[in-house]
Structure formats: C-alpha cells, structure tokens
C-alpha cells in the first residue's frame, strides 16, 4: 500500500499524508511509510502512558512534615488544620501502599471533614494536597445532590468528575481525591427524623455512605440519571480520599450549650464567651455534628475532623503578598512584562483586607476587590510607554484617587479624571 502523490510521484506518509519533501525523514515498512513527525507524536503518546503508570505507584509519599512545608508555600495560617491534613493524607496513601492490611490488622480510610468559615482556605488546602501528590482531583457541590430518583444530581456524578479529571483512566481515578464543598447544606432539617422525605438532606447523606466507605460504584459515562440500557464505568472507591468541607453556620450555639454556657439571658458569662468565641469551632465533637443534622453513620465515615479559623486582617495581607501564587505577585509579574513596576502601599493592602472582612468573604473576596482596583490600570498601562512605575495608594483602594503613575524621568503623571470606586 504505497502512497504516491499523483502530480509528482512522491512518496507520502501513510498516517498524516505529508509528502517526502514536507518532512525530514520517511521510514519505509511493509507496504507503508511513516514520517519523523508521526514517529515523534507516537513516542510522546507512549511515554505519557508509561509516565502515568509510574506516577501512581506512590512509593515515595511525602512525610507529614514535608506535606506541611509545601502547604505553607500556598496557604497562610491554619497551622492545626495543615497538621491534621498532612497526617491524614500520609496515613491514607501509606494504607494504599500496604494493601490496607498488615499482619491481619485492617487499616480503615481516613476521610476528612473540614469545618471553617467562607474564604478560610478549605478548597485551597484540598487542591494543594492533590497537587503535592500529583493525583486526580475533583470538586463537587453537595447542594446540587439529591437522593436517587429525584430531580438533581446522583452522588455517582461526583465520581464521574474524578474520572474525567483522570482522563477516563479509572485506575488513576481510584487513587484520587474528591473535595465535597457545602457539606453542611445536606444536614437533616430537624434533629428528629422526619416523616416526609428529605431528598437533599438525609437522603443524600445515606446515598454518600457507600462511596465514602468503599464500594464498586456504577457511573454513567455521560453523567445524568441512570437508565437500564446504558453502559456504566465501574470504579472502586475504597482508595479514593474524600475531603468534605463546610461553614456549618449555626453550630456554635450547639457547642456553647454542650460546654454549659448560656446562649442568652441574664447572668450569661459574657466575658468568657467572648474569649472563647474565636476558638469555639476547634472544640467541636461528633455529638455536635449529630445535633446539627448529620446522621451518625455519615459522621462515622469522616473520622478526621479539623477546623479552620476565621482569617484576621494580618492573615489576609499575608495572603495577598506571601504565597507563591499570591495575587499581588501575579499582578506585579504581569505589569513587569509590560516594563512597569507595580507597588502596593502598606496602607492600601490593609484597606483591601478591611474591605474583605466587611464583606465576610474571607480570602475569596480579595481577588474581586483587587481586580476592581486594577481594571483601569491593566487596560491603560500597556499603551503607556512613558510610565515606569505604578503605585496603588489607600486613596486608590477607597476610590478617591487614581493610582500614582511615575515616568522614566521620575516625574508624576497628572490625572485629569478620577477612577471609579
């Protein structure tokens, strides 16, 4: 099956159709030709497959101290949470390496429950763990899940996201990490079991039990609801690490009540309550989660419970400037590529942190605040070859004055208009 060009009688690659003049080398086989470009492409595909196989042997799982050190590069504060996560993740993958049984001792899964306010770093911690271990990672929102047979997503769709993250390599997906956000939203609506169906609360908790513990799940490859005439992807969830996170708004009074403090009324220990308010979440116990609305079986599948603290002003400033992927560093690098030096005054950073605290969005709100400040700067400066430096002041953050622009000769650019708040 020789391939010839009809016009010049030249040999062609049997795979891509390029002629011998269009490639550097054409290798002949029995009845076929292959060019150097196709050989290179095939080699890359094979190497990628072999690389993936080696990648998931987990022979060199980082030690807890090493995991914590890498987390410190990306996540500010939350020292106790980092320590708990590092130990839990290390034990989980050590269990996988050992085959989950050592001398007739069965090692159980160490799924994790993270409790902390919005924007405290729950999702970022889970994402960073997956990056450290180089495993497939998927995020699911518990609020979109419903019990099988009702409008909404089946719990198996969570597993589909992980399979997709692993490029449909089921073996890789079986050693991945799934982060389920807003897990507190599937709490039972009442402490007492209801007569009516709670399809997005207790029903979802019941549906999640099996996959959290470890089962062979049947996942519809295209997502959506199952129907009898479709093929399923079979995946074993035994070695998938599940990390669940939620704000658990309203659990503090439950913890206070257990600790014997009065929630309201005369004679309440106000001073003591104020002192302990910040550390209240760290005292959470499984019995508090039970009263909040999680069922006992579900709590039992999440043996590692860790709490995150609300971020204070200084922590938010550190988040803006210190991590490897800090947003201020990113903007500095982007403007540096245009030949402009970017500087944020200390007072400006403090004002940004205050705004995030006022909005009660934690670290998540920092990006939207900075993007609002930087929009005009990023729009105009690439066209301004005369500007050497841009300084963001506290007045810029408050919307009173535009950023201070300095020319190459050291003179300040005079602005005729104000930027929007």
UniProtKB/Swiss-Prot annotation:
Keyword Cell cycle applies: no
GO cellular component terms, semicolon-separated: HslUV protease complex
Keywords: ATP-binding, Chaperone, Metal-binding, Nucleotide-binding, Zinc
Residues that hold ATP according to the record: 117-124
Pfam families reported in the protein's UniProt record: AAA_2, ClpB_D2-small, zf-C4_ClpX
Chain sites annotated for binding Zn(2+): 13, 16, 35, 38
GO molecular function per UniProt: ATP binding; ATP hydrolysis activity; ATP-dependent protein folding chaperone; protein dimerization activity; unfolded protein binding; zinc ion binding
Entry superkingdom: Bacteria
Biological-process GO terms, alphabetical: cell division; proteolysis involved in protein catabolic process
Annotated ranges, domain ClpX-type ZB: 1-54
Oligomer status and interactors: Component of the ClpX-ClpP complex. Forms a hexameric ring that, in the presence of ATP, binds to fourteen ClpP subunits assembled into a disk-like structure with a central cavity, resembling the structure of eukaryotic proteasomes.
Protein task: ATP-dependent specificity component of the Clp protease. It directs the protease to specific substrates. Can perform chaperone functions in the absence of ClpP.
Record family assignment: Belongs to the ClpX chaperone family.
HAMAP family with a match to the protein in the record: ClpX
PANTHER family hit by this protein: ATP-DEPENDENT CLP PROTEASE ATP-BINDING SUBUNIT CLPX-LIKE, MITOCHONDRIAL, ATP-DEPENDENT CLP PROTEASE ATP-BINDING SUBUNIT CLPX-LIKE, MITOCHONDRIAL-RELATED
Protein name: ATP-dependent Clp protease ATP-binding subunit ClpX
Organism listed in the record: Geobacillus thermodenitrificans (strain NG80-2)
